[in-house]
Amino acid sequence: MKFLVIGLGSMGKRRIRCLQALGFQDIVGVDVREDRRLEAQTSYGIQVHSDYADSLKQHTFSGVVISLPPLLHVAAMQACLKHSTPFFVEASVVDDGLADIIHAVKQQGLLAAPSSTLHFHPAIACIRDIVASGALGTLSNVILHSGQYLPDWHTYEKVSDYYVSTPATGGAREIVPFEMTWFTEVFGFPHNVACHFRKTIHIEGAEGIADTYNAVLDYGSFLANVTVDVVSRQATRRLLINGSKQQLVWNWEDAAVNVFDGASAQWTHLPYDSGTSAAGYNKNIGENMYIDEIRAFVDAIEGKAAFPNSLDNDHAVLKLLYRLESTDAVGMAQVMSP
């Protein structure tokens, strides 16, 4: 199988490593930046080009991996549609032109695989199974905190030098749908939502973006509180689920999902292995989930299994983000001083 990777930044390089980990060596990488092309060619021994439109004309690919900044996704997907080539696309935060892409994909019957990385995290898989089993009892409330420190994302370049510094594709804004993709898979979509988002601290290069989102999701029978930020000096992902029978606690620092049973007053610890992390990445960001995600894309190309995410679902998650943001304008009740 032959693959085209469009975009040779941090995610494009990661996807090349994933493909090579799966045994694929016939890879063409595309980037407009000469330094990135040279790095990918030297580090991974792949062919490189500067224009993906030309690459799609010159070669026949089994699949395309789109690892560009979000605002460039649609043009790359259109190119894949033009050449009837299955594609995988990184998580996005903007939906301009996406409805037309979805329509065209359905008309062609083309495989489109939008990223759902955390679906493949062993902790999320464990949590998904536990919630679905009903073992926790009747759910009461859920608390999720996903926090990172924006300058830690790309230590080799300034925040102002790439897309996370602009309002439409800001770092915190991007992580909301990244988390909501797995969250809605586990709990479904909420009935009602409320959210406030703000810029709270100074981060050089991120002056124009909100760095913190606080949301309340109303599921009717239970409530969820979700905080996403890019101001956490230690990268954090913590989840608490309160049920009538059991309480589930996950802190990714522990490498285990922990469940407290009310009847026995005992904890059950469910350890997992997310694999080693690549150089320069947080130790909790193991490579296995990224490899498994690309494996799922390859399996979908070969007709072995459906990819676990769709553009329709991706669009629904983005609409959830926009609905959350729209509620911020409603304002809040003033608390009077005693």
Spans of model-derived segments:
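Conserved SAM-binding strand-loop segment of SAM-dependent methyltransferases
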Residues: 45-52
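Predominantly a Rossmann-like dinucleotide-binding segment in NAD(P)-dependent oxidoreductases
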Residues: 118-196, 201-205
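N-terminal Rossmann-like dinucleotide-binding module
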Residues: 1-44
